[in-house]
UniProtKB/Swiss-Prot annotation:
Residue spans, topological domain Mitochondrial intermembrane: 1-14, 88-227
EC number: 7.1.1.9
Cofactor binding, per record: Binds a dinuclear copper A center per subunit.
Keyword Nuclease: no
PANTHER family hit by this protein: CYTOCHROME C OXIDASE SUBUNIT 2, CYTOCHROME C OXIDASE, SUBUNIT II
Organism: Speothos venaticus
Binding site for Cu cation A2: C196, E198, C200, H204
Name of protein: Cytochrome c oxidase subunit 2
GO BP field: ATP synthesis coupled electron transport
């Protein structure tokens, strides 16, 4: 979950987000080592009188600083490509939910059910109950079963939007006339918050997303009540 004044990433709730966190740490360590090396070299050149500051040609050095960055880029690219393919892979989803962005709310349709759809609007600040989050609560949450592969079909009715839930590692553009898809699977129950992540007009900040991940039995009860 997110915390006030949080500096790091949110706790991972899906396998994809776990992979993204590991990749972030992996890449950050490489950047830290490179920055430390560059800082050390600059400090040495400024403090050591024996440094060759007027060298015009050094084939060995040029070879090293060509091969070494190439190796580093490969070490970054390989895990990145692996995660990219994992994010696009959808194997036998148990449930499909169609999401449409509007100015300025979301519509959801459970395509596996005959008539299960609703709109999701932000709850105004003056109507919030004690303990609810400002600018993040909605009148209709998206209830989904946990530990099951779910396919989200995402599009827009008007302008560009972006459907994003950070703790699940999700961010997919909602484009008018185009149907994008992504997959999600939560490893534990709970409420997961997101927001529209593409500037879409004056009320862009008032398009929250709330996913309520529950056990399958609870989801079946909820869907029966909604029909």
């Amino acid at each position: 979950m997110a915390y006030p004044f949080q500096l790091g990433l949110q706790d991972a709730t899906s396998p994809i987000m776990e992979e993204l966190l590991h990749f972030h740490d992996h890449t950050l360590m490489i950047v830290f080592l490179i920055s430390s090396l560059v800082l050390y070299i600059i400090s040495s050149m400024l403090t050591t009188k024996l440094t060759h500051t007027s060298t015009m040609d050094a084939q060995e050095v040029e070879t090293v600083w060509t091969i070494l960055p190439a190796i580093i880029l490969v070490l970054i690219a390989l895990p990145s490509l692996r995660i990219l393919y994992m994010m696009d892979e959808i194997n036998n989803p148990s449930l499909t939910v169609k999401t449409l962005g509007h100015q300025w709310y979301w519509s959801y349709e459970y395509t596996d059910y005959e008539d299960l759809n609703f709109d999701s609007y932000m709850i105004p600040t003056q109507e919030l109950k004690p303990g609810e989050l400002r600018l993040l609560e909605v009148d209709n949450r998206v209830v989904l079963p946990m530990e099951m592969t779910i396919r989200m079909l995402i599009s827009s009715e008007d302008v560009l939007h972006s459907w994003a839930v950070p703790s699940l590692g999700l961010k997919t553009d909602a484009i008018p006339g185009r149907l994008n898809q992504t997959t999600l699977m939560a490893t534990r129950p709970g409420l997961y918050y997101g927001q529209c992540s593409e500037i879409c007009g004056s009320n862009h900040s008032f398009m929250p997303i709330v996913l309520e991940m529950v056990p399958l039995s609870y989801f079946e009860t909820w869907s029966a009540l909604m029909l």
